[in-house]
């Protein structure tokens, strides 16, 4: 169990521009403040991930994404809400409301409301976060804290402990407008 003090410490670090590792539902994640360009580019460099691929935003609850939903049909919001919190990621139109270092070359952004207690507590404190698997490009995602340390020894600002959520697969990714499954879970 992760103490609230450690989660609050992680929140302070994120607000100050940190890149952190933390447990998620299936694998360890890397995250940072999506509005902090330097932090996002540092995260991308750690992963050797090109900016044009775009990144996932995670949140504590659907309301943290309200700024994106102003012109959305109500059934879209209901569709997402019926699958959250949980292992469902939706590609939604971002309407140029997010920076390109988050969206990449896409006109959509990937959103998920996590059901992992550590992630939810962290997002409740700081708002939506960038979330990507904790691994350098081409390597398997970290499933243990030891693997996180082996991959990124000394390069992360904080490693927030805790247990993985027990899922075996990453979240399913669907296009909200079409319903198409982009990545099975």
Curated annotation (Swiss-Prot):
Residues 4-185 form the YrdC-like domain. InterPro entries: DHBP_synth_RibB-like_a/b_dom, Sua5-like_dom, TC-AMP_synthase, TC-AMP_synthase_SUA5. It catalyses: L-threonine + hydrogencarbonate + ATP = L-threonylcarbamoyladenylate + diphosphate + H2O. GO terms for biological process: regulation of translational fidelity; tRNA threonylcarbamoyladenosine modification. GO terms for molecular function: ATP binding; double-stranded RNA binding; L-threonylcarbamoyladenylate synthase; tRNA binding. GO terms for cellular component: cytoplasm. Its EC number is 2.7.7.87. Keywords: ATP-binding, Cytoplasm, Nucleotide-binding, Nucleotidyltransferase, Transferase, tRNA processing. Disulfide bonds: none annotated. It is found in: Cytoplasm. Required for the formation of a threonylcarbamoyl group on adenosine at position 37 (t(6)A37) in tRNAs that read codons beginning with adenine. Catalyzes the conversion of L-threonine, HCO(3)(-)/CO(2) and ATP to give threonylcarbamoyl-AMP (TC-AMP) as the acyladenylate intermediate, with the release of diphosphate. Belongs to the SUA5 family. TsaC subfamily. This is Threonylcarbamoyl-AMP synthase. It comes from Pseudomonas putida (strain ATCC 700007 / DSM 6899 / JCM 31910 / BCRC 17059 / LMG 24140 / F1).
């Amino acid at each position: 169990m992760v103490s609230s003090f450690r989660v609050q410490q992680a929140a302070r670090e994120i607000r100050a521009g940190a890149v952190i590792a933390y447990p998620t539902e299936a694998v360890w994640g890397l995250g940072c403040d999506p509005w902090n360009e330097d932090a996002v580019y540092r995260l991308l460099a750690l992963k050797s991930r090109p900016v044009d691929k775009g990144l996932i935003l995670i949140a504590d609850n659907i309301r943290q994404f309200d700024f994106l939903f102003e012109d959305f049909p109500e059934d879209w919001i209901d569709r997402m809400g019926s699958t959250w919190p949980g292992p469902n990621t939706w590609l939604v139109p971002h309407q140029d409301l997010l920076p390109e270092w988050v969206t990449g070359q896409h006109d959509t952004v990937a959103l998920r409301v996590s059901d992992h207690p550590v992630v939810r507590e962290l997002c409740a404190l700081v708002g939506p976060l960038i979330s990507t698997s904790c691994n350098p490009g081409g390597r398997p995602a970290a499933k243990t804290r030891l693997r996180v340390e082996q991959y990124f020894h000394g390069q992360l600002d904080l490693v927030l402990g805790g247990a993985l959520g027990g899922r075996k697969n990453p979240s399913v990714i669907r296009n909200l407008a079409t319903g198409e499954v982009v990545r099975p879970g």
